[in-house]
């Protein structure tokens, strides 16, 4: 629509420099910045190196990732270090399903979970840093998952055209059947949670595109789940906040909430 295009045309998308360390290799080869050397002890590095390229390789389970900002926080606390430091214990027991919650049984469109009243979307498959306890390691690690129809593939990311088409279709069927979908028993889809991964690693333009598309489709409440406030708080800058202000001005009827994750 015209109002959507006017909103999107004003979005600024600066580049952000998180100074990430990606993977264990920089720690193995001591190629991390000088101030980050020693984050893993020699014995910790040796224990992880032995597992490399074996079935118990911790990065086959989920890649290691760390921002400079979170390193500065973690270096002061052993407890916080455990959140992002890989250990051999992660792969002691690899039994079980990659989809223990059977989420794929409730995915009518790639990248969307619609099990309950609200919908949850995977809009990105990474975060600024990776918590080692992450319960979506199959998504972060890009693992193949068995679908309800028996096919096996990696979880796909949500795409705007497919999601918007599903919202319109679902809500039209609900409206035509007394407020309840005749097959699933679900009511009108009013609320969407943007998740992943962390939506805040996306550019402002991509976040804005999701927000406006969902608003135009009649979604009444949008939530964004993020740990970026802990990993890289500089992401919440003037350009991003200005975009949010303009979104509220353009779509005052839509509630927008941030679900901010911290460990403490």
Name these PLM-found stretches.
Residues 84, 88, 235-236, 240:
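Solvent-exposed, flexible loop/coil residues
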